[in-house]
């Protein structure tokens, strides 16, 4: 397959933080176009192993091509939210111990730029937005059937869009004329309902982000996967996460902080010592892309890297 152009954000920083043992076994929860996976493989010895996940069929095709040329690598067509069961089977069969988990939560550039995937407010295409376009509800199906109150809630909650109610009203009014099935039509509807555009940001950005997050259950899956990773990792294992907007980063930051502090309970509640146990150690401060990377890839401007180690 011809490799599409995609820049893996914070590549060196994330892979250096992840790979502490060249003979170790690692998980890349979001293969995408394989930039991080290839960088991990470069740091692994012949004994090292990498297991990657993605629910996007196109990404899986690239991953299987890589698996065919490198026997240290395996590709799984599934969401990272299901990685614990896959890992349990692989670990039992091969007597593996997990050295680290990497989650790059960004949508890959090819996904954003391919009109037919339905993520873009810049290119017209069918209003889909599913990461796995072989199953589940499309954005168009939801947009054309959801109550106005649900539309407003999703756009506000997952897009942090202050004009969510206006956008929801506009969507309902327009879909009564005819179903909304194309990305540019939706982009125009929500843009016209946004009276105060943020400088340098398309007026449909937040609404499209919100709908994508909702359709793919991104925040629910992230929360569940962080908890799974903690259970899967042994002492010394690394959890490396790259987030791309404040909602994701808030979840990651809070999870790592809470697990580094240990559980908090109300005064007077009877607890055992293991219930108070600290389970993670955060490593350094959150990292952002440097000037050079920003110049090469403007989409890296919103990326935040956080790293923690299992105690």
From Swiss-Prot:
One Pfam family cited in the UniProt record for this chain: Methyltransf_5
Cell location: Cytoplasm
InterPro entries: RsmH, SAM-dep_MeTrfase_MraW_recog, SAM-dependent_MTases_sf
Residues reported in the UniProt entry to bind S-adenosyl-L-methionine: 34-36, 54, 80, 104, 111
SUPFAM superfamilies: Putative methyltransferase TM0872, insert domain, S-adenosyl-L-methionine-dependent methyltransferases
EC number of the protein: 2.1.1.199
Family (UniProt): Belongs to the methyltransferase superfamily. RsmH family.
GO biological process: rRNA base methylation
Gene Ontology cellular-component terms listed: cytoplasm
Keyword Metal-binding set for record: no
Record's function text: Specifically methylates the N4 position of cytidine in position 1402 (C1402) of 16S rRNA.
A GO molecular-function descriptor: rRNA (cytosine-N4-)-methyltransferase activity
EC class name: transferase
UniProt keyword rRNA processing, yes or no: yes
UniProt keywords, alphabetically: Cytoplasm, Methyltransferase, rRNA processing, S-adenosyl-L-methionine, Transferase
Catalytic activity: cytidine(1402) in 16S rRNA + S-adenosyl-L-methionine = N(4)-methylcytidine(1402) in 16S rRNA + S-adenosyl-L-homocysteine + H(+)
Name assigned to this protein: Ribosomal RNA small subunit methyltransferase H
């Amino acid at each position: 397959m011809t490799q599409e152009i995609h820049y893996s954000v914070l590549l060196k920083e994330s892979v250096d933080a992840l790979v502490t043992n060249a003979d170790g076994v690692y998980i890349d929860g979001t293969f995408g176009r394989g930039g991080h996976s290839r960088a991990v493989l470069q740091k692994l010895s012949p004994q090292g192993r990498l297991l990657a996940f993605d629910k996007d069929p196109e990404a899986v095709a690239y991953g299987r091509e890589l698996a065919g040329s490198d026997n240290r690598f395996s590709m799984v067509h599934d969401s990272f939210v299901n990685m614990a069961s896959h890992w349990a089977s692989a670990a039992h069969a091969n007597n593996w111990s997990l050295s680290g988990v990497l989650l790059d939560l960004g949508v890959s550039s090819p996904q954003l730029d391919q009109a037919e995937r339905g993520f873009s407010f810049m290119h017209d295409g069918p209003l889909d937005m599913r990461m796995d376009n072989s199953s589940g509800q499309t954005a168009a199906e939801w947009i054309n059937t959801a109550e106005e109150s649900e539309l407003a809630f999703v756009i506000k909650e997952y897009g942090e869009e202050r004009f969510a109610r206006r956008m929801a009203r506009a969507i309902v009014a327009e879909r009564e004329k005819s179903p909304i099935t194309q990305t540019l039509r939706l982009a125009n509807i929500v843009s016209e309902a946004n009276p105060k555009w943020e400088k340098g940001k398309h007026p449909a950005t937040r609404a499209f982000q919100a709908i994508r997050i909702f359709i793919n259950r991104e925040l629910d899956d992230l929360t569940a996967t962080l908890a799974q990773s903690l259970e899967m990792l042994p002492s010394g294992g690394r959890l490396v996460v790259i987030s791309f907007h404040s909602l994701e980063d808030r979840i990651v930051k809070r999870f790592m902080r809470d697990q580094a502090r240990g559980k908090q309970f109300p005064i007077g509640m009877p607890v055992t010592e293991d219930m108070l146990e600290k389970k993670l150690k955060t490593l350094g401060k959150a990292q952002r892309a440097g000037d050079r990377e920003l110049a090469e890839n403007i989409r890296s401007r919103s990326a935040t890297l956080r790293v923690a180690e299992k105690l």
